[in-house]
């Protein structure tokens, strides 16, 4: 997958923060080499977070996020500040842009404390260096720049690159479960909710990971699954299905063949599968009047039969036999207070970076609200979670302990 096609969730997210008129947007435009944000002498020109996916050398694929000033005022200003601070949830590296002619302000000091509290690596870019004297020595994560004079911008980018955490061993979606020449069957329903002319991102990424493992990927609809399996001389190593077809696919795939879902694979990839497994047990305890939050990390046009807003609520009501209520969020929106919910059911999070997914998990756990995901919940409600977790022995044991406990 080329840099230009790198999914947003796999890119380093760099957030630029600061007070109004510190020259934050001007610095962003210099760093990106294009007019990403409108600049003006009028305070509060940036009214909403603006983000752009691009390649930023020497880092590579990134998402640059320019945020409103954190000192905005009035009712509208307070909302802008809230949105700016929400960006921290997905920020891998923070850049605080200051006006070097006035020194660090109390609000900027508070922001630095937030970076430290959330363990976000940060850089301080003292802008307007052409209007003040530059100290001979400074901390290694600070630099004086001038957006107006295009000064020290390359050095700022190098400083940001050094703030990137050392690359961890590459995580794999499914390749670590496979050997070269293994056959994997992917079951992809084509219904009214499926996008025209393409596969969705989780399916694309899974196919790519299978190919990189030297394995063989076969893609079929559930309606052709039986014929696909019969055409093979040997049973496939693994069958991966869209979660909504779990019930049908479970009946068609021989019990000696391992079966899981795209959603479960992505939960493991994002590091939240264990919590999702434990959260699924809450489905057994839902009561009349409980509210379940169903949250998706992307936005798409809702159609009849949508899995999040129609199928999941119907399955949950049928499984529990209770009058359960539902709330829905999509994209960047996630409630600041989830304590009113009995359960959060989240999508696989393919469009979210790891930091944002971990924030949502931690946010729910701190309020003692269980969280599970689409694939785990659907498999549990269809009575096949035990089978769906068989490819992951340690996690399978965690579910067995929960189910029998």
Language model segments and positions:
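Conserved C-terminal guanine-recognition region of P-loop GTPase G domains, centered on the G4
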Residues: 52-60, 79-144, 172-176, 199-215, ...
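Conserved G1/Walker A P-loop phosphate-binding module
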Residues: 1-78, 86-89
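Redox- and metal-dependent alpha/beta enzyme cores, enriched for Fe-S-associated oxidoreductases
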Residues: 266-321, 329-333, 338
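G-domain G4 guanine-recognition motif of GTPases
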Residues: 67, 98-101, 122-136, 143-151, ...
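An anion/phosphate-binding loop that grips the pyrophosphate of nucleotide cofactors and donors
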Residues: 91, 236, 341
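Short helix-loop-beta junction
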Residues: 205-215, 310-325
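C-terminal functional extensions of proteins
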Residues: 288, 293, 311, 319, ...
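Canonical P-loop GTPase G-domain recognition
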Residues: 117-176, 183-185, 214-223, 260-261, ...
């Amino acid at each position: 997958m080329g840099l230009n096609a790198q999914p947003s969730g796999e890119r380093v997210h760099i957030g630029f923060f600061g007070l109004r008129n510190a020259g934050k947007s001007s610095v962003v435009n210099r760093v990106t080499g294009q007019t990403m944000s409108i600049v003006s002498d009028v305070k509060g020109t940036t009214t909403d977070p603006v983000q752009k996916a691009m390649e930023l050398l020497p880092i590579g694929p990134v998402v640059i996020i320019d945020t409103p000033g954190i000192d905005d005022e009035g009712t509208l200003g307070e909302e802008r500040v809230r949105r700016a601070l929400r960006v921290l949830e997905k920020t891998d590296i923070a850049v605080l842009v200051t006006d070097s002619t006035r020194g660090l302000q109390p609000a900027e000091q508070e922001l630095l404390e937030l970076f430290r509290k959330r363990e976000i690596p940060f850089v301080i870019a003292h802008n307007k260096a052409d209007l003040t004297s530059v100290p001979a020595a400074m901390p290694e994560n600070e630099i004086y720049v001038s957006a107006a004079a295009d000064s020290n911008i390359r050095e700022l980018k190098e400083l940001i690159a050094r703030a990137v955490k050392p690359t961890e061993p590459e995580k794999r979606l499914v390749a670590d479960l496979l050997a070269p020449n293994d056959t994997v069957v992917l079951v992809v329903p084509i219904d009214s909710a499926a996008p025209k002319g393409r596969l969705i991102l989780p399916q694309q990424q899974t196919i790519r990971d299978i190919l990189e493992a030297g394995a063989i990927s076969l893609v079929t609809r559930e309606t052709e699954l039986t014929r696909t399996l019969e055409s093979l001389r040997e049973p496939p190593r693994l069958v991966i299905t869209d979660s909504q077809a779990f019930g049908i696919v479970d009946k068609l795939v021989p019990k000696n063949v391992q079966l899981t879902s795209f959603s479960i694979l992505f939960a493991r990839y994002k590091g939240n599968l264990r919590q999702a497994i434990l959260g699924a047990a809450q489905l057994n305890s839902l009561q009349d009047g409980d509210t379940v939050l169903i949250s998706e990390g992307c936005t798409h046009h809702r159609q009849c039969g949508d899995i999040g807003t129609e199928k999941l609520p119907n399955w949950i009501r049928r499984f529990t036999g209770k009058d359960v209520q539902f709330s829905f969020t999509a994209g960047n929106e996630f409630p600041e207070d989830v304590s009113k919910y009995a359960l959060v059911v989240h999508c696989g999070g393919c469009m979210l970076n790891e930091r944002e997914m971990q924030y949502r998990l931690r946010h729910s756990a701190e309020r003692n609200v269980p969280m599970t995901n689409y694939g785990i919940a659907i498999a549990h409600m269809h009575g096949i979670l035990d089978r769906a977790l068989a490819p992951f022995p340690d996690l399978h044991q965690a579910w067995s302990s929960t189910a029998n406990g």
